[in-house]
Amino acid sequence: MTEGYIVKRFGQPVKRYVQILELKDDPESLASYRKAHSREDFWPEIKQGIQEVGILEMELYIIGTREVMIVETPLDFDWDKAMARLAQLPRQQEWENFVGRFQKCKEGDTSDEKWQMMERFFYLCED
């Protein structure tokens, strides 16, 4: 982890959203949650839907029970419209219910209800 992560370039300016979510404090649950997001087990309809609404990249980071999601999109991306559309796409609510078993949330919550948008309060470069 101390070697860092390569950042993909998209050939266009992008904007970034950062959200946080709390997971249930149970080692077995955390392992199952991570497995659900593995290349082998991640539902293809969910990946397709995420890309279909205009998301260029989505990354998940975890420490303990705290999960951070970084989403990169084109500059003209409208978060509220995209999330409303995503919620209607095939298997999306089924996925939310499935992963909700591992998350500290209410049953039936949508992705937008579970994740809290974070505020950027510092950046090093002025650009």
What are the residue ranges of the model-derived segments?
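Acidic, low-complexity proline/glycine-rich segments
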Residues: 1-13
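Short amphipathic alpha-helical segments
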Residues: 29-54
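Short, charged/polar surface micro-motifs in flexible loops or helix N-caps
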Residues: 26-27, 67, 74-79
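An amphipathic, aromatic/His-enriched active-site/gating alpha helix that lines ligand/cofactor pockets
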Residues: 53, 73-114
